[in-house]
Amino acid sequence: MFLDRFHSVQDGHVVISALQASQFAKEIAGDFNPIHDPDARRFCVPGDLLFAIVLARFGLSENMTFRFRSLLGENVPLKFVETENTIDVCDDAGKVYIEVARSGATTRDEELIETITRAYVAASGKNFPHTLKPLMESNGVMFNPDRPMVMYESM
């Protein structure tokens, strides 16, 4: 599976190191946001990597909504709690990082899931430098390009 080098499984939990997360952001998503640099003071795992892991583990449904609830730091053991129509990505303390709602037919076709995942995260990774930054500049909005912090709630 193409995601294997971007996380590990320890005692039944998914664990993502800062280096693994950063490599995914840069190599797969084309996302060079400094917050995904392994040595960033406010490092966080890219939501796109969690999105990709959910699809790889649980398949792709016709309708899916991903709600990002918390920033994920490095090396947090994650569990995936699945019900009929939801998947929660959380830690052992119960802190939820992503809530996924899904409905409709589900495919587990690995080739299709990888193709869709790669296409989606490649577009998502370019969202900040190619879409948001020019839009903000054209509207006279100031931000620090060395430390951009763009957060979104859902996709």
For every predicted segment, state its role.
Residues 1-42, 63, 73-76, 81-134:
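Catalytic strand-loop segment that frames the active site of acyl-thioester-processing enzymes
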Residues 43-65, 118-155:
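Active-site helix/loop of acyl-thioester processing domains in fatty-acid/polyketide metabolism
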